[in-house]
Amino acid sequence: MWLLLQLVWLCFLLSLGLNSWHQSKVPEYPDELRCGLRSFQFTINPLSQETETPPVLVAWDNHGLPHSLQNDSDCGTWVSEGPGSSLVGEASYSGCYVTEWESYYIMTVGIERAGVSGSGAFIETKLFKCPVNLPDVPNAGLCDSVPVWDRLPCAPSPITQGDCKQLGCCYNSEEVISCYYGNTVTSHCTQDGHFSIAVSRNVTSPPLLLNSVHLAFRNDSECKPVMATHTFVLFRFPFTTCGTTKQITGKQAVYENELVAARDVRTWSRGSITRDSTFRLQVSCSYSASSSALPVNVQVLTLPPPLPETQPGNLTLELKIAKDKRYRSYYTASDYPVVKLLRDPIYVEVSIHQRTDPSLELRLDQCWATPGADALLQPQWPLLVNGCPYTGDNYQTKLIPVWEASDLPFPSHYQRFSISTFSFVDSVAKRALKGPVYLHCSASVCQPAGTPSCVTLCPARRRRSSDIHFQNNTASISSKGPLILLQAIQDSSEKLHKYSRSPVDSQALWVAGLSGILIVGALFMSYLAIRKWR
């Protein structure tokens, strides 16, 4: 019997060692992404220089199912070993694992790495995102030809290579100024309605006279360069100044301006000459005429009298998704789409925007999810019904109290809840629908805050009604972007194409089988010994 106990204990220890592969914490690691003209080009580095095993890559298709990422010309993927146990990969924008969302190509990659000194394995999902219309990124010659002492910062550090390239600038992670302008003309339009134009003196041959470069229609003090060096001149000005013209073409609002450079002309009694290049640059920015990011002409006048304590006005709401249950940080518009595994928690916050009346209390009426940005799109799934969790869900929505002791200025202006992520299912084919999931809520404001009439009571059991009815005097709000929900590798119930099961799983099965044989054998030997003794 003592031998039997030893065998059982040995199997238990082996199982703990194998299970630690699933429980390790994911560390930080440096990786690189380059947005090519036709494909993602990325490098996945090992966790440590001491690690000799390269990471293992997994990609998810449009149905949320995982596949081993390997060389596959049909799916447009190529993977090879790089220096120092790293992996170099490429994925075509038109391949099996890339989705076009708004103005970006997106791809989710799962990375399994071996820990330092064989301490276990780590898995993390990584979202690759590249713009559909890439800006004109300067080539290596235009970047390397700028001396270090003449480099003009394009964006403050730290900045990723992808973000720097989106600005059309040069990138070198080993320099103090990692993102800088190349020897060309670099222009971009900001979301707050400004032109940003950098001109290199070497954009023409012979070089420009930088001190003569100016806006063609206005040369006021506010229209002069904001920065000038021996090699570069930088202009930054609003669309509403410096002679900028505006035209509405269809659904597009186009803002245009022009830069010119004077020439040094030498004159004598019999003629004039110049050795300078002709330079005339027209820049334009296009915005959707219906976009909320469209710049507006704002005039600053004398301050109006203070607003009364209570006044009628439009109800403006904001729906945000927090990065963790503490609600310390939130996903911004640039973070979408947010990638989550099925059943992962999503922490939602709805708040009253731009109101300072402490007597207001926000009440959530209905909250629901759709597979598209349209709040009325079908199918739908209820999250909150009349302010209470929908009881027809086996993973019910959880209401999260906003305490008075929180650091929020007006706690009654906030409502929070969490949901477990899910995927919509085709009611006919009984298969998970591909595509994103959007969240929506309708809400109203109650006064005075804290009174019984402003409190929503949720009984233990409610009628399973999933109909969404909008009440009068309510406002609706939607998430800033979609959620992409993936099927977990370990939970996949379907046979995965091109994906082999983890060697750890096969080892676990082998240990379990061997344990069973040893236990049965030990019991049988004990039985024979007892029978012989009798």
UniProtKB/Swiss-Prot annotation:
Prosegment residue ranges = 462-534
**Membrane topology category:** Single-pass type I membrane protein
Q: Which residues cross the membrane?
A: 510-530
Q: Which GO terms describe its molecular function?
A: acrosin binding; structural constituent of egg coat
Give the UniProt keywords, A-Z: Cell membrane, Cleavage on pair of basic residues, Disulfide bond, Extracellular matrix, Fertilization, Glycoprotein, Membrane, Receptor, Secreted, Signal, Transmembrane, Transmembrane helix
What are the residue boundaries of the P-type domain, all occurrences included?
141-183
> What protein is this chain from?
Zona pellucida sperm-binding protein 4
A single GO cellular-component term on record? egg coat
Function in brief: Component of the zona pellucida, an extracellular matrix surrounding oocytes which mediates sperm binding, induction of the acrosome reaction and prevents post-fertilization polyspermy. The zona pellucida is composed of 3 to 4 glycoproteins, ZP1, ZP2, ZP3, and ZP4. ZP4 may act as a sperm receptor.
